[in-house]
Amino acid sequence: MSLRDALAAAALLLAQASAAWAAESYTFDASAFEKKPFELGGYVEFKQQYYDLNQDGAIYLLNFYNDPREQLNETTLTFKPSGKFRYGDASLNFRANLEGSWETRGYEGDARFDELYASYKPDPGLTLDAGKISLKWGKGYAWNPIGFVQRIKDPNDPELGLQGYTMLAGDVIRNFDGPLRTVAFTPLVLPANDDINSDFGTGSHTNVAAKLYLLFHDTDIDLAFLSNGSRSRRYGFDFSRNLATNLEIHGEWAHVEDTQRSVTTASGSTTVTRGDAESYLLGLRYLSEQDTTYILEYYRNGLGLTETEMQNFVQFVDNAYAQYLATGNDALLSRAASLAQGGYGRPNPGRHYLYLRVTQKEPFDILYFTPALTVIANTDDGSTTVTPELLYSGFKNTEFRLRAVFLYGGAGTEFGERQISSRIEFRARLYF
């Protein structure tokens, strides 16, 4: 055999061996893509927080008038498992929350299901759900005016999973050719009384809500409705559309009928105002060539307090605290605390807000490192919160976050009268 023939034979054998190895190495395993009968995931979280208290703030005075402090430390351990059991077309889904918090003043624990519901899907276009479900209505990142049947987000941590409500819900989806590509209808029934969904609203009612989703000319549109019952009747819509591959615009609008607001004068005289209210949101999301993500939103809260109403409440708290110091009588402070729980002390109780979040992916080529900055401003009184944070996920199934929250504002402003002036937080999560 000549050298040429030997080389040709060797090349042929090598090619056959390589082909056989490739066929063996890249064999498609369909079982790897089959749905498992049971799935389990979640995370364990350790969180340490340090609070610098705002001793001149109205909310601080309500909570610490008889126990003055300058700082608080809080350690929290959280276990959040989630899973799914499948049996044919049915499944049982859950997301639990087990939490223990050790604070300077004592310990608090909580154990609950954020979600626990059965689901039946006999057809890809039909789903029936029953149980405790956490819905996500609305396109806004920090706020959702049309989130009629869900709990309010924390704008400082809007991606945190929320607790759901117990309900019966369905989902019907149909796809088409043409400008209208998808239609989805989601009706639901949400009972509320002293025993079930007791914090959804007032009275004992069977509430009916629905959402209609349309994908029309590459624009996502939702029409939402909630019947009159535990909460007053409300309806609205949202939309989202990509203006470019790296630029998205979104918005929401909601109309709430016969809303009630309790407002107080500086002397403590409380009145209830009634009337319809409109809330809306408009936002942009932009991704730059440097992998920097910008989220900008404007939110108008039609149910919120005016600047004057907030200042009257602050003056009432100051007067109540002065009476307590002079007489030891805390009756006015107790009344002010009830008003705070009803609206004044809730997150973002004002009328007009701006939200900006800037996130930079892996700056200076530091892998798995993501710094971010969040700013929330009350545009009526000029007070703001500024939240810088650092996120690192370079270890397998592990995430570390360090962030600080700084509140700025003068006397009588929303963030200037809060319980804290700053907060430092370290969080570690182990996912499984």
Where are the model-predicted features located?
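Repeated loop/turn-to-beta-strand initiation elements of outer-membrane beta-barrel proteins
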Residues: 88-94, 125-128, 177-183, 216-223, ...
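Solvent-exposed loop/turn segments connecting transmembrane beta-strands
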Residues: 71, 103-109, 160-162, 196-206, ...
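Membrane-embedded beta-strand positions of outer-membrane beta-barrel proteins
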Residues: 42-44, 94-96, 130, 170, ...
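Transmembrane beta-strands of outer-membrane beta-barrel pores
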Residues: 46-52, 85-89, 98-102, 134-136, ...
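Outer membrane beta-barrel
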Residues: 76-190, 214, 409
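Outer-membrane beta-barrel "beta-signal"
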Residues: 170, 354-358, 418-432
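Beta-barrel outer-membrane channel/assembly domains of diderm bacteria
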Residues: 22-128, 390, 399-403, 421-427, ...
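Extracellular/periplasmic loop regions
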Residues: 248-367, 373-375, 415-417
